[in-house]
């Protein structure tokens, strides 16, 4: 290249073309000066959809929502300096959730690093603890051989592509230093291509002979966590043929099927004193939400088998006896060919206690006025065509306990399990799905900036906001009794915020509810941008939850 602008243009147009070739269709851009070359290249590409979000932290979570909704990798782009650091929470969540987030950070040229230049921090390897792949690109120089630069880009993107699909999925980081002038030549649009490449396929085949002896034992359990869009029909088929109960996390999507072998009330039963024994456990997918079930897995003597379709198995809460890196469908298809034993009585015990528990839960909800009553009512309003995104902390735990008859899809950020970026993730999903957000007041406050994407892009999202003026989940922890004098200031953390003002700021309709009877008339099927605020009381919420545990303990007369 005989001038800087042409070299820069060739570089960024090639990068964007390669990103498209490997399946990137959406990019979330946080505006800034140093990212000018890539931002213009992305905007000029005829088949890429760009989203503009001025807050990098929220932007990265919005991209995560786009990934969850589209089931495709998504890229994010920011300028240099502290802007990139704001991506860290979402990158850590993507890493633990095995989501292919493509992180594009613009950077100052090498001669401005480490000398106190503005907006210049050390961006190389800055996400090393979380990304699957990282590369610091060379600067486009006017005397560069264009083939060398193009080949470098293509080689690095080819290497990075293995982490966008299959069991190796996870975030990748491409750091791109640019020297001024920063504007590429937009008349060279013919350098932008829309070719696609054969995407890598990664699937190991594994023999299951080493666990054949386990299949001859009677008390077997299948525990299924978040399956991240994986096919699960063979789990149900295997369970039907072999009479094995399935303890299904709501994020597994198996509860939607209303299969007679699927157990939904296990967390409440364990909290209420159920004693559980098993010979072996097949753990599928990511770890479950239920703290009580995870505690049992940690101490049980049952033989544990882990099945996850990624090369970084999530072994929590305890390392299994054997682990398989393969899809659930392939695993259970092979397992079905093994000889087995009669388990009808074992399954019927589970079905009986599940049936009795559901009766008690529904009876309790008829008179309850706490957050569980509202959550149960929200789930009752949703149909099989709906989806719900659930915030961490108390909302996801209530959904875990009360998702019984609902047929909606359930989603949550259960990688790092934080309360940051929840609204932004839900808004990203809302681009591709009709979705309702269930969230607490602290998580909502934490990501109010994210609501701007709804206002700017007319993204419709119904938000059910559970407002107990603080951190309700802490009321259940030992700190409530052990450090009561300090509890409200350090853990209760009331804010006293009036969220009606938030609705006005971001053009959301707003309704506030003080009683469950009034909320029953709320029509969540009328989709728009709407905040349904529910006022609750933390201590009352705790006492009514404890009342439900007591009811269930009275029906437990069997050891499973």
UniProtKB/Swiss-Prot annotation:
Note describing how the cofactor binds: Binds 1 thiamine pyrophosphate per subunit.
GO molecular function: 2-succinyl-5-enolpyruvyl-6-hydroxy-3-cyclohexene-1-carboxylic-acid synthase activity; magnesium ion binding; manganese ion binding; thiamine pyrophosphate binding
A biological process from GO: menaquinone biosynthetic process
Cofactor dependence: Mg(2+); Mn(2+); thiamine diphosphate
Enzyme Commission number, as recorded: 2.2.1.9
Reactions performed catalytically: isochorismate + 2-oxoglutarate + H(+) = 5-enolpyruvoyl-6-hydroxy-2-succinyl-cyclohex-3-ene-1-carboxylate + CO2
Domain of life (superkingdom): Bacteria
Keywords: Magnesium, Manganese, Menaquinone biosynthesis, Metal-binding, Thiamine pyrophosphate, Transferase
InterPro entries: DHS-like_NAD/FAD-binding_dom, MenaQ_synth_MenD, MenD_middle, THDP-binding, Thiamin_PyroP_enz_TPP-bd_dom
Gene3D superfamilies: 3.40.50.970, TPP-binding domain
Pathway: Quinol/quinone metabolism; 1,4-dihydroxy-2-naphthoate biosynthesis; 1,4-dihydroxy-2-naphthoate from chorismate: step 2/7; Quinol/quinone metabolism; menaquinone biosynthesis
Stored HAMAP family: MenD
Family label: Belongs to the TPP enzyme family. MenD subfamily.
Subunit organization: Homodimer.
UniProt cross-references to NCBIfam families, sorted A to Z: menD
Function according to Swiss-Prot or TrEMBL: Catalyzes the thiamine diphosphate-dependent decarboxylation of 2-oxoglutarate and the subsequent addition of the resulting succinic semialdehyde-thiamine pyrophosphate anion to isochorismate to yield 2-succinyl-5-enolpyruvyl-6-hydroxy-3-cyclohexene-1-carboxylate (SEPHCHC).
Protein name, per record: 2-succinyl-5-enolpyruvyl-6-hydroxy-3-cyclohexene-1-carboxylate synthase
UniProt source species: Staphylococcus saprophyticus subsp. saprophyticus (strain ATCC 15305 / DSM 20229 / NCIMB 8711 / NCTC 7292 / S-41)
